[in-house]
């Protein structure tokens, strides 16, 4: 079974941090591609190790990624 999840990747110093907000699972890498691949691996390990109750408890149904315009200064 496969599932589509959100991956948010942002630069952090010399590398990148990746986050899956639906499950609150994170990883990192030296490049965007590596951070994405490492997040995929972390998610696969989570699904292998977590009970169905843990998955249900942590899995949020809806995640919205959007931009917000704010006044600065």
Regions found by a protein language model. Name each.
Residues 8-22:
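Short aromatic-glycine-(Arg/Gly/Cys) micro-motifs in beta-strand/loop hairpins
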Residues 15-17, 31, 63:
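Compositionally biased, intrinsically disordered low-complexity regions
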Residues 23-32:
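A short, exposed loop/beta-hairpin motif centered on an aromatic-Gly-Thr core
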Residues 1-8, 33, 37-73:
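Short, charged, surface-exposed hinge/linker loops at domain edges
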């Amino acid at each position: 079974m496969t599932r589509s999840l959100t991956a948010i990747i942002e630069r952090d110093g010399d590398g990148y941090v990746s986050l899956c907000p639906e499950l609150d699972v994170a990883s990192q890498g030296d490049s965007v591609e590596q951070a994405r691949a490492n997040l995929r691996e972390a998610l696969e390990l989570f699904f292998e190790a977590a009970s169905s109750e843990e998955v249900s408890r942590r899995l949020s149904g809806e995640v919205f990624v959007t931009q917000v315009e704010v006044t600065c200064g």
